[in-house]
Amino acid sequence: SDFHSTDVRELLYDCLRGTEHLAQQRNLRITPIFDDDPVTVSCDEIHLRRAFTNIITNALRYAKEEIIIECRQEKGKAVIRIRDDGEGIAPELLPHIFDRFFSTRKGGAGVGLALTKEIVSLHRGTVHASNDGGAVFEIILPIG
């Protein structure tokens, strides 16, 4: 796989263009809050874009009005936060959402978040889900 130095903000804008139709369909706002300066990571763009898209698509599925996407550099790391204003993740499900084949959607294969975690791990990063109003997904990647 090809790792290149990439501005995460650009990748996220790509993902937003790719999920725009879903946002419009559901009449949702997407609010990006990005650093003014590049947030650079060494990554396989195709894979990392897929990881982000999986989370953004989920957020758009559960949001009521808005999803907020933050991207910034913090203490030598790239921090990406994707939050929705939906019901949040049921506490009993939180420990399992990254498990392979686990899905809350009937008929959903549930490989989305497991694959996301795998991709983030390949980039020496972490992904963590929590609730703060709606669901919050935080991806932390090494800068480089």
Language-model-derived ranges and their functions:
Residues 1-2, 40-43:
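Conserved micro-motifs of the catalytic ATP-binding
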Residues 2-17:
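A conserved beta-strand-to-alpha-helix junction within the catalytic ATP-binding
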Residues 66-76:
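Short beta-strand/loop element within the Bergerat-fold HATPase_c
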Residues 84:
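Acidic ATP/Mg2+-coordinating residue in the GHKL
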Residues 89-101:
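Short conserved segment of the HATPase_c
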Residues 112, 116:
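Short alpha-helical Gxxx[C/S/T] motif in the catalytic ATP-binding
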